[in-house]
């Protein structure tokens, strides 16, 4: 969390973040702080929110490849996707090469630290 607080203060964001654990309040608080730091004026044109296990990884990749509209980056928040239990190889491979104009923020209850997604996120975020 120290690194995350530093990123929020400096405005130098990594391409991907993972917030996980049982503490729903803290996850929501950090999610909101990151969103506000990336979009200080409240503009949500470059903000996308996905929730649940039926998320299509290809759709996330397409959105991340889309250039942000009059902003430095696009924020894509993915909550409770299950990607860190049942990894999406396509998304895990993409995270390793994703552009600096996109930022994935994963908010999960659990994350398998042995999984491909966790390792990909750890290498980039």
Task: Put a short name on every predicted segment.
Residues 1-3, 10, 14-17, 24-28, ...:
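Non-catalytic interfacial helical region
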């Amino acid at each position: 969390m120290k690194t995350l607080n530093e990123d929020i203060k400096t405005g130098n964001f990594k391409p991907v973040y993972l917030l996980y654990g049982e503490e729903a309040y803290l996850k929501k608080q950090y999610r909101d702080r990151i969103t506000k730091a990336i979009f200080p004026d409240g503009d949500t044109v470059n903000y996308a929110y996905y929730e649940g296990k039926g998320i299509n990884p290809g759709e996330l990749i397409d959105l991340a490849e889309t250039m942000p509209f009059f902003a430095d980056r696009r924020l894509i928040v993915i909550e409770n996707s299950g990607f860190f239990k049942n990894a999406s190889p396509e998304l895990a491979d993409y995270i390793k090469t994703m552009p600096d104009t996109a930022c994935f923020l994963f908010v999960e209850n659990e994350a398998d630290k042995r999984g491909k997604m966790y390792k990909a996120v750890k290498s980039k975020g």
